[in-house]
C-alpha cells in the first residue's frame, strides 16, 4: 500500500462543524509529522492555520492523498478536479447522507490513522464527460461522478428529444428530462426517478427518463463504454439545461446535441478496511435489517 506523506485538505465552506473537524484533522496529521496542505478557499476562513496553501487544481500535483471534509457534494466537486491526477481521495462526513464520505467525525483519528498505516481499500469510480454541441461546435463541457441530467430549467414544460447509443437510434421521448448516471450516481437522483441501484464495481451506465409521457418509458442499463447522444428537438420552444452533478450547468437550444461517455481518468476513492457497500445502503437508504434483529 502507498505511504502518504503530503496530505491535502478540502472542506465545505459555510460550516463551523467542518472548520472544527479540519482543526482536529490538522492537529492529528501534524502530530504524525506529515506535510499538510490546505485548499486556499478553506484557508481564508481558518485564521492562524500556519500551513501551506494551494488551489484545488494544484493539490492534485503536490499531494499523495487528499482528505475531503464535508458531504457527498463536497466530494463530488473534489472528484471532478482531482480524477485527472490519479490521486487517492478520502472523505470525512460532515454532510447529510454520506454515501461517499464514510468516516464519521467521532472516529476521525482511529480511521485516518489506519489509512495512514496502510490499512485501507481503494475503489476506482469512473466519471462521465458531457459535451453540448450546436451546429457542430462545442458550447459546453463538463464532468460528473454521479450524473449528467437534461432538464427544463426554470420552465415547467416537457422536453422532446431523441436518444442514440453508439450511433444506433434507441427512441424519441417527451419527458421532464433525462438522467444519465454512473453506478456511483445510481443511488442519487437516478434512484429518486425510479432507476436501479448498481454496485460501484459495475462497468455500466443507466439512462433514466424523468416522468416520461408514456407508459413504456423505463430505465435502461448499457455498457459503461457506450457513447450516448441526446438530440434536443428542433421544434422545442424552451431552452433546457444540462447539469453535471447538479453543480455545473449549460443552457441548450432547440436542435443541440449532448454527448455523454466515460471519462478516461477515474477517481481513486479510499475506504477504511471493513467498508461494506450493502451496509452503507442499509444505513443510508433505510433498508431492513436481519429478521429477529440479528446484526451478525
Swiss-Prot record:
Coiled coil: none annotated. It is found in: Cytoplasm. The active site is at residue 72. Its EC number is 2.7.1.23. Its cofactor is a divalent metal cation. InterPro entries: ATP-NAD_kinase_N, ATP-NAD_kinase_PpnK-typ_C, NAD/diacylglycerol_kinase_sf, NADK. GO terms for cellular component: cytoplasm. NAD(+) binds at residues 72-73, 146-147, 157, 174, 176, 187-192, 247. NCBIfam families: PRK01231.1. Belongs to the NAD kinase family. This is NAD kinase. It comes from Pseudomonas putida (strain W619).
Amino acid at each position: 500500500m502507498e505511504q502518504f506523506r503530503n496530505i491535502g485538505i478540502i472542506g465545505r465552506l459555510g460550516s463551523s462543524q467542518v472548520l472544527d473537524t479540519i482543526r482536529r484533522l490538522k492537529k492529528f496529521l501534524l502530530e504524525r509529522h506529515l506535510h499538510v496542505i490546505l485548499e486556499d478557499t478553506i484557508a481564508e476562513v481558518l485564521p492562524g492555520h500556519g500551513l501551506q496553501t494551494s488551489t484545488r487544481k494544484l493539490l492534485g500535483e503536490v499531494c499523495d492523498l487528499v482528505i475531503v471534509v464535508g458531504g457527498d457534494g463536497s466530494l463530488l466537486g473534489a472528484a471532478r478536479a482531482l480524477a485527472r491526477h490519479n490521486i487517492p481521495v478520502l472523505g470525512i462526513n460532515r454532510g447529510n447522507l454520506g454515501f461517499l464520505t464514510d468516516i464519521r467525525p467521532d472516529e476521525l483519528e482511529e480511521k485516518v490513522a489506519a489509512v495512514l498505516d496502510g490499512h485501507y481499500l481503494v475503489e476506482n469510480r469512473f466519471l462521465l464527460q458531457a459535451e453540448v454541441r450546436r451546429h457542430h461546435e462545442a458550447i459546453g463541457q463538463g464532468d460528473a461522478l454521479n450524473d449528467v441530467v437534461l432538464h427544463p430549467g426554470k420552465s415547467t414544460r416537457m422536453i422532446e428529444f431523441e436518444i442514440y447509443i453508439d450511433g444506433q437510434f434507441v427512441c424519441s421521448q417527451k419527458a421532464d428530462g433525462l438522467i444519465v448516471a454512473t453506478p456511483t450516481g445510481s443511488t442519487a437522483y437516478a434512484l429518486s426517478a425510479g432507476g436501479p441501484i448498481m454496485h460501484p464495481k459495475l462497468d455500466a451506465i443507466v439512462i433514466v427518463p424523468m416522468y416520461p409521457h408514456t407508459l413504456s418509458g423505463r430505465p435502461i442499463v448499457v455498457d459503461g463504454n457506450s457513447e450516448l447522444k441526446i438530440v434536443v428537438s428542433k421544434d422545442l420552444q424552451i431552452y433546457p439545461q444540462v447539469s453535471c452533478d447538479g453543480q455545473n450547468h449549460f443552457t441548450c437550444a432547440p436542435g443541440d446535441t449532448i454527448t455523454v461517455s466515460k471519462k478516461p481518468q477515474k477517481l481513486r476513492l479510499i475506504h477504511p478496511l471493513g467498508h461494506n457497500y450493502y451496509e452503507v445502503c442499509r444505513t443510508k437508504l433505510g433498508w431492513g435489517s436481519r429478521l429477529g434483529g440479528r446484526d451478525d
